[in-house]
Amino acid sequence: RFEKVPDENDLALIQRIEGGRIPYWYPTDELPDGEKMSDPRNAGVTHVHQFYTKRNLWVLSKVFDTIDSNENNLLKFLFSSMVNRATRMNRIHINNYFHGGGGCNAGYLKGTLYISSIPIETSIIEQVKDRIIWFNRAIKRMLFLHQRPLISTNSSNKSLVPSNSIDYIFTDPPFGGNLMYS
């Protein structure tokens, strides 16, 4: 593994990013009150944009600005599928970091807003590449399906689904207070 000690150019770049004003829109909403909001507040996060490093927030806001101006819902879908992996909530995978094998990004802790004391910053460019690869694989797999999957959220007594045509039903179980839905 290669480790680089930051030189004067690196430090100047960091200072320029941290001191600069991001010229693109990004959300700055205050976090709402809630049962699980003490975790981010304990880490100094009181507003949505504080979940991101300044560098990642800058790049994400530029990417979103470009996508939003094109009004392309597919690109917005891909963007929304990667923003959670760009936050300060990403944790380091200690075993992989020190001993190799897989990536050192363990991702975020699902179902929480926990910010690790040792967060890991991910490259937005790598995230975009990953999402494009993921999406292409998903499209290829869908092309092999003989029948299109059907999702129905209407009343069961007004169903348009023919009898004996359902292979699988997924229901979202109630988790009580374990997961916050709002």
Residue ranges of each PLM-predicted region?
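Metal-dependent catalytic core segments for phosphate chemistry
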Residues: 168-182
